[in-house]
């Protein structure tokens, strides 16, 4: 089943896609992580929503610098707090 995304999420994803298609090719590959920071941002926003996804993306971008080791850094899974505990 497809999930519905808010207008804010759609706008943020479009901005990241614009960066991927128009800006990133001009500056070349620079990300030290897998998935790339822009792919991470799209996945974080789609998984966690506009606010938390943006926060996770900002934290990730701040970690992506020449002194960073980089490596595999996936988007954390969404935790469902509505699950009944037995």
From Swiss-Prot:
InterPro entries: Membr_insert_effic_factor_YidD. SMART domains: Haemolytic. Pfam families: YidD. GO terms for cellular component: plasma membrane. Could be involved in insertion of integral membrane proteins into the membrane. Belongs to the UPF0161 family. This is Putative membrane protein insertion efficiency factor.
